[in-house]
């Protein structure tokens, strides 16, 4: 039974903490040591780009591994260990089929369901002396700000590994960086609408990690009251959902959403569709009672589940199982009890400062995948595919109207991949960012940027073998985290580089760290004037990050037709708005300068 906020689980955690006070092992051969609530860990000392050192603790379990009967269950507390645990090598990634990252994601630790681990990176001077008990006095030792980062990957692939999420740019600026793995695809987002599998296991894993951070932050020199939750792509969508969730309240203070998207539908109708396609691939009758399906899934070998999951990914393109709105289940506190937009409109999450980022050419990064699945050919057969999955509840006579609006704006009577990529960028990334900023601004600071710096030597483009103008999906992330799989070992001269790429990495990491510390990406009189927060009930402004010398260029999304078109396309929450939309023509939008 899922009870992540229940008194029973909290009591169990308290018992574990009291019952196991880690005995101090021999730490003489350990470069960097830290205690946790379940035992001591031995990490490694590494060098950041500034030349400073940090302690890196890899593959630290934040819960018991979900094996066997625990495959789809709420995570249980991690089991304690007596000797010191080596934490110098990354653990396995969660089971997945990667159709996007290519050689950028190395999975150096293999792949396994025993993947529930966190990676903790701490400036060496902040790490508590292992010879002394950690200070629990916040006034005497306030602790460093903590960035908890949720990796992206369409809810289906990816990891918190340092191949893409190297902390070298951030830890040198006085913050702690924590990345982690969570269950993916069917293991993380299957819903049987039952007490055994209510859905959103990957989100529950994230809440479990956040609770672990609250209990263990002091052991690593961090402040449990200064946690910023960040994510990229699917990870940003998860972070945004958790800003709305009562189950995650008080576990973090700020949120950073990079390439946030609402490209998935959290509806029960979508759940039924995905399940009806998936279960037959495993020889399971989709009409069986939920408890019987659950048992069959537990008994099914992992390789068979992954084979079926790959077939489903090939059918859908990238994303399959996703976060869903949970129905009421006795004894279970839902992560997501209603559509995120409904919760936003009710005022939920407006007390959390937000930094929202997107790139100017998001979907160029997906060009190889869209070519592989022949997305243009699929649209020719099914024109309604140009419409966002969030609008799939439209009736048959409304879908063609929305599709016509999209065709008029993006294709000019010629359906091609270039037009689709522009549509994809606007529909799944740019407009959701505008919409979210508009809905959440006013009561708390909300800032937004568009990253359009293409780079001199882009690690992202090199890693995927891509060439295009501007910045694609994930590309801004590579100026915040170091792409170690492409860049290789940190060079001795890297900290002294002064080219535009190095300056941009410094600028972007400054933005993240400033927001973590001050709830403003550019604090001080200069920044307040050049990067104002988004005003309530007004079209959101964003800053154009297109180079280290031109990062302060303000933009307004209403300066082109894009915002007008999508405001009309998405104005479908009420019947009246649908009727208004059906009479809309892009010709009537007025440009503002």
What is the predicted function of each stretch?
Residues 2-19:
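Cleavable N-terminal signal peptides of Sec/SRP-targeted secreted and luminal proteins
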Residues 3-7, 105-294, 344-367:
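Serine-hydrolase-like catalytic core of hydrolytic proteins
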Residues 49, 422, 430-593:
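Mobile gating loops/cap/lid regions near enzyme active sites that modulate substrate access
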Residues 147, 207-210, 214, 275-279, ...:
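Non-transmembrane alpha-helical segments in soluble domains
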């Amino acid at each position: 039974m899922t009870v992540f906020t229940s008194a029973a689980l909290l009591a169990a955690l308290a018992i574990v903490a009291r019952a196991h006070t880690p005995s101090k092992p021999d730490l003489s051969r350990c470069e960097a040591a830290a205690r946790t609530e379940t035992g001591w860990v031995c990490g490694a000392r590494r060098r950041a780009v500034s030349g400073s050192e940090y302690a890196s603790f890899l593959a630290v379990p934040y819960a018991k591994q979900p094996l066997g009967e625990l495959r789809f269950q709420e995570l249980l507390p991690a089991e304690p260990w007596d000797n010191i645990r080596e934490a110098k090598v990354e653990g396995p990634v969660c089971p997945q089929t990667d159709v996007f990252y290519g050689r950028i994601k190395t999975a150096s630790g293999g792949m396994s369901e025993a993947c529930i681990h966190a990676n903790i990176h701490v400036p060496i001077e902040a790490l508590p002396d292992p010879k002394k008990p950690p200070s629990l006095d916040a006034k005497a030792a306030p602790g460093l700000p903590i960035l908890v980062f949720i990796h992206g990957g369409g809810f289906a692939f990816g990891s918190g590994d340092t191949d893409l999420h190297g902390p070298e740019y951030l830890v040198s600026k006085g913050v702690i960086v924590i990345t982690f793995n969570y269950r993916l695809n069917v293991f993380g987002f299957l819903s049987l609408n039952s007490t055994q599998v209510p859905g959103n296991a990957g989100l529950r894993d994230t809440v479990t990690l956040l609770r672990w951070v609250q209990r263990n932050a002091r052991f690593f020199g961090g402040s449990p009251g200064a946690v910023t939750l960040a994510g990229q792509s699917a990870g940003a969508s998860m972070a945004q959902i958790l800003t709305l969730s009562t189950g995650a309240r008080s576990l973090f203070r700020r949120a950073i959403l990079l390439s946030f998207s609402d490209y998935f539908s959290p509806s029960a109708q979508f759940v039924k569709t995905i399940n009806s396609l998936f279960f037959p691939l495993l020889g399971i009758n989709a009409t069986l009672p939920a408890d019987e399906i659950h048992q069959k899934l537990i008994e099914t070998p992992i390789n068979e589940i992954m084979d079926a999951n790959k077939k489903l990914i090939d059918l859908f393109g990238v994303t399959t199982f996703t976060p869903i709105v949970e129905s009421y289940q006795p004894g279970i506190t839902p992560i997501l009890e209603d559509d995120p937009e409904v919760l936003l409109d009710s005022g939920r999450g407006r007390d959390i400062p937000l930094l929202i980022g997107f790139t100017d050419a998001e979907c160029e990064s997906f060009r190889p995948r869209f070519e592989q699945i022949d997305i243009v050919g699929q649209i020719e057969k099914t024109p309604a595919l140009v419409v966002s999955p969030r609008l799939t509840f439209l009736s048959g006579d409304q879908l063609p109207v929305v599709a016509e609006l999209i065709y008029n704006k993006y294709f000019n009577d010629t359906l091609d991949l270039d037009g689709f990529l522009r549509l994809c960028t606007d529909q799944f990334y740019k407009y959701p960012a505008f919409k979210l900023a508009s809905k959440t601004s006013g009561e708390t600071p909300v800032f937004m940027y568009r990253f359009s710096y293409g780079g001199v030597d882009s690690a992202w483009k090199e890693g995927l073998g891509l060439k295009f103008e501007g910045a694609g999906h994930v590309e801004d992330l590579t100026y915040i985290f170091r792409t170690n799989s492409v860049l290789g070992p940190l060079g001795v001269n890297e900290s002294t580089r002064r080219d535009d790429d190095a300056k941009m990495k410094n600028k972007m990491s400054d933005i993240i760290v400033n927001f973590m510390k001050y709830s403003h990406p550019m604090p001080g009189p200069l920044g307040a004037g050049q990067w104002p927060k988004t005003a309530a009930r007004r079209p959101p402004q964003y800053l154009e990050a297109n180079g280290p010398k031109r990062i302060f260029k303000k933009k307004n999304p209403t300066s082109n037709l894009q915002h007008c078109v999508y405001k009309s396309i998405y104005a479908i929450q009420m019947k009246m708005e649908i009727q208004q939309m059906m009479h809309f023509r892009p010709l009537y939008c007025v440009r503002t300068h």
